[in-house]
UniProtKB/Swiss-Prot annotation:
Membrane-spanning intervals of the chain: 560-580, 605-625, 626-646
Mode of membrane association: Multi-pass membrane protein
GO biological process: plasma membrane fusion
Entry comment, domain topic: The extracellular N-terminus has 4 domains; the first 3 are structurally similar to fusogens from plants, C.elegans and viruses, while the fourth domain is unique to archaea. Domains I and II are discontinuous. The fusion loop in domain II is stabilized by a Ca(2+) ion so that it protrudes from the molecule.
Organism: Haloplanus natans (strain DSM 17983 / JCM 14081 / CGMCC 1.8972 / RE-101)
Annotated compartments: Cell surface; Cell membrane
Chief localization: other
Region Fusion loop: start-end pairs: 155-160
Gene Ontology molecular function, alphabetical: metal ion binding
Gene field: fsx1
UniProt name for this protein: Fusexin 1
Cytoplasmic side of membrane: 581-604, 647-653
GO cellular component: cell surface; plasma membrane
Quaternary context: Homotrimer stabilized by interdomain contacts and numerous Ca(2+) and Na(+) ions.
């Protein structure tokens, strides 16, 4: 746009809502409303909208919109007057002609012939006779797809049978038949637009020309768009008992015929055709009588339907594929709406200008926040224009992972004043690792009066929190070894164990926890007093740590399997304590009394604790594996039996 003083040159669009009726010839000379808006769908810049709603009858529009009237109603300055006239209306109904598979109207010819054999009769009938019932007829033991009558007699002179056939064949046709579709009301008006003493812009506007009838060029600098519902107050003639027949011998290629006479024609042939052939065969009717009867029906069916309101309709399209008829209507248009858009830019047709607000971004700020929270970005906007501005701010696109609120914020800002706008920004990432992300978000500010826009971008930064499933473990490869990580709180992962040597991470505890084991083994737990595994001194053998199950219970992470493992291990400890303390305690007891001054109960206690611990550890290695659990239960039964056997008192009789 070109700046003129403190104003902006712009486009101007005049919007006229027109109403027509058929009962008077008064001219419309003024508009009811005039407003000044931004932009149009056809030209850049501002829009001058003039609306007219008539409350009286009129068949002609002759509007004069003076420069002073434009200024008084909008505050904008126009350098020329604007006039618009609409006249010379023509209204009609357009009826499309549609091919729907209707049969043609045929003429008919009777045929008969005598044959020596049935085969000769059959061949002649199937090659020459017409099918008018879509049923066929039986000839001997065969059924034809055509209609015919036949008779036979014995010729004593030749000593053989003779055969005679009677049938009808089509003898030309009058034309193809089409349905008449629902009508479209078409209007045609002449438009003339002029700014000052410049060359007028003219156009013919009609809703019957498809796209060009909806939006037409009104010269080089203006466009006219019809957008209302056409209503004349009169319905077009109804199509009730009409069809159309197409042929070169009809004026314009089409003729309107009666649907009832057409149906009577075909119903008579289908229902009475075979009866007529039988009458001919029996000698009751002659060939000429039947031909005259059928062709009379055909002639009547193709006659012009003079009683129809479309009998004298003008042919708009003579082709069979897209035929159309035109019926003139006497009434005038009522309530059509028209938009007139006039270019008033730097090189436009009319010049209009108006002081407007002018936004300028004087400061901005970004945001830094964590993933589970949000931040706010903001701008300060100053009105550096000569009039109050209505400034609308909106947050635009952001970098990947960042989203800004889509809400638009509008404020009225006086000249020289500043307004602040802020928008909420959030962050979303699918990453599982903790990291920082940076990006930018755009903010655009528009003066709704002029359409002028200014924009900027601000920085945003967010910290990604590590994410994981609480209680679940994962395995990663590091330096060729499996490293087990756990998720204690659902937000971050931490290192749990490293599987070295031949050990690999395998699932245990219902597939939510891992353990370092040799390939091909399952179950288990490792590291520290409550680690999942511990290593035997000297031998270096790694064993599952029973105390790990107690850790799961104390931490609240135990499941049903953990409880069962602890219960079985505890029973094994009690059984081992009792068995070793009683059975082996007696042996060690004897040795101790010779070399160690300790009471028997102390020795049994120590031996029982050591034995119970070793048996409990061995049992835990088994119960961490489902198959081992079954073997362990059987072992406990055997151990219980041995315990009872060893502790049973001897009874001497």
């Amino acid at each position: 746009m070109k700046r003129v003083g403190n104003c902006w040159k712009a486009s101007v669009a005049a919007f006229f809502l027109l109403m027509f009726t058929a009962f008077a010839a008064a001219d419309t000379t003024s508009v009811d409303t005039v407003s000044y808006k931004s932009n149009s769908e056809f030209f850049d810049g501002e829009v001058l909208q003039a609306g007219y709603v008539s409350n009286f009858a009129t068949d002609k529009i002759n509007v004069h919109l003076g420069a002073s009237e434009i200024e008084s109603k909008t505050g904008a300055t126009a350098e020329e007057d604007l006039t618009l006239s609409v006249s010379h209306q023509n209204t009609y109904a357009r009826y499309p002609l549609q091919e729907t598979g209707l049969k043609k109207i045929y003429g008919w010819e009777g045929m008969k012939k005598t044959f020596d054999t049935k085969d000769q009769l059959w061949n002649w009938v199937t090659s020459n006779c017409a099918d008018f019932t879509e049923g066929g007829v039986a000839i001997g033991d065969r059924t034809s797809k055509v209609e015919a009558a036949a008779k036979s007699w014995y010729d004593y002179w030749t000593g053989s049978y003779n055969y005679q056939a009677f049938c009808l064949r089509k003898n030309g046709y009058y034309g193809d038949v089409a349905d008449i579709g629902s009508p479209d009301e078409i209007f045609r008006t002449e438009w003339r637009l002029q700014a000052g003493d410049k060359n007028p812009q003219t156009a013919i506007i009609t809703n019957g020309d498809g796209g060009s009838g909806v939006v037409s060029n009104l010269g080089r600098y203006a466009k006219v768009k019809w957008q209302g519902n056409l209503d004349t107050g009169q319905n077009p003639p109804l199509v009730d008992d009409e069809l159309a027949i197409h042929g070169n011998n009809y004026e314009g290629g089409w003729r309107v015929i009666s649907e009832q006479r057409y149906d009577n024609y075909w119903n008579y042939i289908k229902n009475d055709g075979n009866r007529l052939l039988d009458k001919w065969k029996s000698g009751d009717y002659s060939e000429s009588y039947i031909e005259g009867l059928l062709n009379g029906k055909a002639e009547n069916a193709q006659k012009r339907y003079s009683e129809s309101p479309l009998a004298n309709a003008e042919v708009l399209d003579s082709s069979f594929q897209s035929g159309a008829l035109k019926a003139d209507m006497d009434s005038r248009l009522a309530y059509p709406e028209f938009n007139v858009y006039v270019d008033a830019g730097e090189n436009g047709y009319i010049t209009v200008s108006k002081p407007v607000g002018k936004p300028k971004i004087v400061s901005s700020s970004g945001a830094s926040f964590g993933e589970l929270s949000s931040g706010r970005i903001s701008v300060d906007v100053k009105n550096v224009g000569g009039a109050e501005g209505s400034f609308s701010a909106r947050a635009g696109s952001c970098s990947q992972y960042f989203q800004a609120d889509a809400l638009q914020n509008t404020k009225r800002v006086a000249p020289g004043e500043t307004a602040s706008y802020s928008f909420r920004v959030t962050f979303t990432s699918t990453s599982m690792q903790q990291a920082s992300y940076t990006g930018r978000c755009s903010i655009t500010v528009e003066d709704t009066g002029s359409g002028r826009e200014v924009s900027t971008s601000v920085s945003v930064e967010a910290t990604q929190q590590s994410e994981c499933t609480q209680g679940k473990e994962i395995v990663k490869q590091k330096n060729g070894n499996d490293v087990i990580y756990s998720c204690p709180d659902g937000l971050k992962i931490q290192k749990q164990d490293t599987c070295t040597g031949e050990l690999k991470a395998v699932f245990v505890n219902n597939d939510i926890q891992y353990d370092c084991r040799e390939e091909g083994t399952g179950g288990g737990s490792g590291g520290g007093l409550f680690g999942k595994r511990f290593t035997l001194p000297i031998t270096g053998t790694q064993l599952s740590n029973p105390l790990n199950a107690f850790e799961n219970i104390w931490s609240g992470d135990a499941n049903a399997l953990n409880w069962l493992q602890v219960f079985v291990t505890f029973i094994a400890f009690l059984g081992g304590f009792a068995l070793v303390g009683v059975k082996l305690g007696k042996i060690v007891d004897g040795l101790a009394t010779e070399f160690i001054p300790v009471k028997d109960s102390h020795v049994r206690l120590v031996i029982g604790l050591l034995g119970g611990g070793m048996i409990a550890t061995a049992v835990y290695q088994l119960v961490t594996d489902p198959l081992g659990l079954l073997v362990t239960v059987l072992g406990l039964v055997v151990m219980g039996y041995l315990y009872l056997s060893a502790s049973a008192p001897e009874i001497n009789l």
